[in-house]
Amino acid sequence: MDLSRPRWSLWRRVFLMASLLACGICQASGQIFITQTLGIKGYRTVVALDKVPEDVQEYSWYWGANDSAGNMIISHKPPSAQQPGPMYTGRERVNREGSLLIRPTALNDTGNYTVRVVAGNETQRATGWLEVLELGSNLGISVNASSLVENMDSVAADCLTNVTNITWYVNDVPTSSSDRMTISPDGKTLVILRVSRYDRTIQCMIESFPEIFQRSERISLTVAYGPDYVLLRSNPDDFNGIVTAEIGSQVEMECICYSFLDLKYHWIHNGSLLNFSDAKMNLSSLAWEQMGRYRCTVENPVTQLIMYMDVRIQAPHEDLTCCPQRFLHLRIHGDVPHHADSAGWRLHLWSPDPCSDQPLLNQDKSGSMSVHPRPEDKTRRASR
């Protein structure tokens, strides 16, 4: 980055006026002269050369006020040949216009520089003073909070400087006041209202010298959000929220959601909270007592948002109107073996599948219900 002339302080203005007067004398006489007199530590400096004649055969730059061989920094023979000298540090080169480029510039680069230009049968010399300045301390920035909740929290950032020409960057993009962002009249404070998950970084920048910019550190924001949705994926796949699986088979379920930060998972089976907190559940060998409805609940403790999704596991051909009734209370008709216990009369239902197609009850024309006898009961009655 090319550096321009200094400003503000009295001694810099005096120095600038002296340089301009010297340049005017050089211009009047048609001689080459050095125009660049200011550099910034750590940046690129161009010790600019002006009034250069045509058909230059060689540019030679020297450290100090004379062009002795021991002081040579670098020489350049157009179009491309460059020869380093004893004072070469590896940071210097000569551009097409014959100016000396130094990058990065150091404080000890301050001093006189002499250039010798050979063009045809003529050799011209010029000497100029380069002053290298150091920028102030690093630009400071502070925020009132860095851990936030989307659409709920706001953040205020302060640029710690006395300069009022401040540029604010959000996600490395220059920003200005808007419906969601406000910059104070002095430019030193940026407020982001209702932060978004896409607000990732904040930074401020000032122009310390013309075309010389200082940036603060980049502040990272942690914005919690979600869950936006929750899905319950299963293997075997579910159909309309129902997973069909055989007894003894494997069933896998996974709770999927889009959220940030760490989530908490809860599983509920037939209304009972399970002691299980992972996103994935694996039923390696499905049992009857594992049939029924499962609910995966996802909780973001930071945003305090909760979402859930249900799925039902059932056996093939299971009748949804039958399965919830695991016990039947019946009026007893007919001579069917039974016994009484503390709960009253209880039938020995011989079907191993409570939702089997085999009828357990018979209904006569009057509406009375009787138990369908087992085959062994029929044999026993026939032998009497």
From Swiss-Prot:
<protein>
    <recommendedName>
        <fullName>Cell adhesion molecule CEACAM18</fullName>
    </recommendedName>
</protein>
<dbReference type="InterPro" id="IPR003599">
    <property type="entry name" value="Ig_sub"/>
</dbReference>
<feature type="glycosylation site" description="N-linked (GlcNAc...) asparagine">
    <location>
        <position position="162"/>
    </location>
</feature>
<feature type="glycosylation site" description="N-linked (GlcNAc...) asparagine">
    <location>
        <position position="270"/>
    </location>
</feature>
<dbReference type="InterPro" id="IPR036179">
    <property type="entry name" value="Ig-like_dom_sf"/>
</dbReference>
<dbReference type="InterPro" id="IPR052598">
    <property type="entry name" value="IgSF_CEA-related"/>
</dbReference>
<keyword id="KW-0732">Signal</keyword>
<feature type="domain" description="Ig-like C2-type">
    <location>
        <begin position="227"/>
        <end position="314"/>
    </location>
</feature>
<feature type="glycosylation site" description="N-linked (GlcNAc...) asparagine">
    <location>
        <position position="112"/>
    </location>
</feature>
<feature type="region of interest" description="Disordered">
    <location>
        <begin position="358"/>
        <end position="384"/>
    </location>
</feature>
<dbReference type="InterPro" id="IPR003598">
    <property type="entry name" value="Ig_sub2"/>
</dbReference>
<feature type="compositionally biased region" description="Basic and acidic residues">
    <location>
        <begin position="373"/>
        <end position="384"/>
    </location>
</feature>
<feature type="signal peptide">
    <location>
        <begin position="1"/>
        <end position="30"/>
    </location>
</feature>
<feature type="glycosylation site" description="N-linked (GlcNAc...) asparagine">
    <location>
        <position position="121"/>
    </location>
</feature>
<dbReference type="InterPro" id="IPR013783">
    <property type="entry name" value="Ig-like_fold"/>
</dbReference>
<feature type="compositionally biased region" description="Polar residues">
    <location>
        <begin position="359"/>
        <end position="369"/>
    </location>
</feature>
<feature type="disulfide bond">
    <location>
        <begin position="255"/>
        <end position="296"/>
    </location>
</feature>
<comment type="similarity">
    <text>Belongs to the immunoglobulin superfamily. CEA family.</text>
</comment>
<dbReference type="InterPro" id="IPR007110">
    <property type="entry name" value="Ig-like_dom"/>
</dbReference>
<keyword id="KW-0325">Glycoprotein</keyword>
<feature type="glycosylation site" description="N-linked (GlcNAc...) asparagine">
    <location>
        <position position="108"/>
    </location>
</feature>
<keyword id="KW-1015">Disulfide bond</keyword>
<keyword id="KW-0393">Immunoglobulin domain</keyword>
